[in-house]
Amino acid sequence: MLKAQLATTIAFVMCCSSVQAETTAKATCEPTAEGSRNLVVSFYTQALIDKQVRAAFDTYVSPDFVEHKPDVPNGSRSAVVDFLEGLVTELPGARWEILRTVAEKDLVFLHARFSPAPGAPPYAIADVFRVDNCAIVEHWDVVGPPRDGMPNKNSRF
C-alpha cells in the first residue's frame, strides 16, 4: 500500500505544476465541514492575505467556479482572477484579515476585515464559499463599507 502511494506521488510530481498544486490540495483536503474550512482559509490566505491570487485559484478553485459578486462581469473564474489581481495592483497597501469562520456541510462562512490602505477605515466582509470534492465551486459576498457616525457603538468586527 505504501509503495503504491509513493508511486502515485512520483507520477503526480511529473505532471505540470498547476495540476500538482491542485492534486496536493485535494490530497490534503478532508471531505468534511472542517476540511472545507481549512481549504477555504488556505485559499483566502494565499489569494488575499499573501496576494497570490492566480496561484490560489489554480490550487483551490474548480474550473467550473461560479461567482455571485455583482461587481464581477459574467461571474466566471477567470473574471474573478482578473478582478482580484486588478484590486491587488490598484491597492498595493490593502490588507485582508480573517476574523472568524463557520463551516456547515459544504458551506464555509468567513467574516473578514478589509483595509484598502494603511490607516484607511476598514470594510466588513462576509464571504460564503461552497466546496465540492475538495475544491471551491461557488462564492457569494456581502461588503459593508466604512460609515461615519455609526449610531450603534458595537463594532462590526
List each model region and its residues.
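Bacterial N-terminal signal peptides that target proteins for export
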Residues: 1-7
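Bacterial N-terminal signal peptides
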Residues: 7-17
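C-terminal and inter-domain tail/linker signature
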Residues: 19-157
